[in-house]
Structures are given as structure tokens and as C-alpha cells.
Amino acid sequence: LWRRYEEKLLEHMRRFREVGAEVKHILREIDPDVREFVFGSVVRGRFTAASDIDILVVTDDLSKKYEMMVEVYRRVEAPVELHITTPEKYRSWYSRFIPVDELVEI
């Protein structure tokens, strides 16, 4: 049973672009102007069954942050972690820690 579960998790990681597209569809229902990037171990190809799919969400409207989180976590089966921020906060904070070549825009 554990092996099947582990394989399912690894398949989600391999399909991170498809998972990202699913997340983006949900996010766009809430904020049509949102930008989304996948980063982290799945982009580097160094993931395990314990990994998640890190998704950077850039929006001008942080008032919708919790609605976005609730909808994505409720509707997406894959293990994702949302990092929701503004363009300004991305430039001042996230860009210091996430190399540009490890950002995959969805």
C-alpha cells in the first residue's frame, strides 16, 4: 500500500507542469492577473516522495491570498506548497533566494 502511495506522489512530481496548470486554472478563477512559477526540487529534478511542488504566486491583490490557498488545497490532489506574494515582495525577498533559471512560469 505504501509503495503505491509513494509512486503516486512521485508521479505528481514528474508532472509538475500539469499540476501547475491545474493550480493556475484555480488561481485565475480568483485573480485573472495572477502569475505563477514552479521552483525548487521538482524543477531541479531532485525530488523524493517526501517533496512537494513549490509554487510562487505573484499577485497585486493579497486580500485574496487565503481564498487562493483554500481553493487550491481543497481541489488539488498533488502535494503543493503555495508561496503567495506581491511583485514588490518578490523583487525584494524571493528573488534573493530563488535563482531565475530555477523559476518555471506556468
How would you describe each model-predicted region?
Residues 1-34, 43-50, 59-106:
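Catalytic core of pol beta-like nucleotidyltransferases
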Residues 53-55:
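Amphipathic, hydrophobic secondary-structure cores in small proteins
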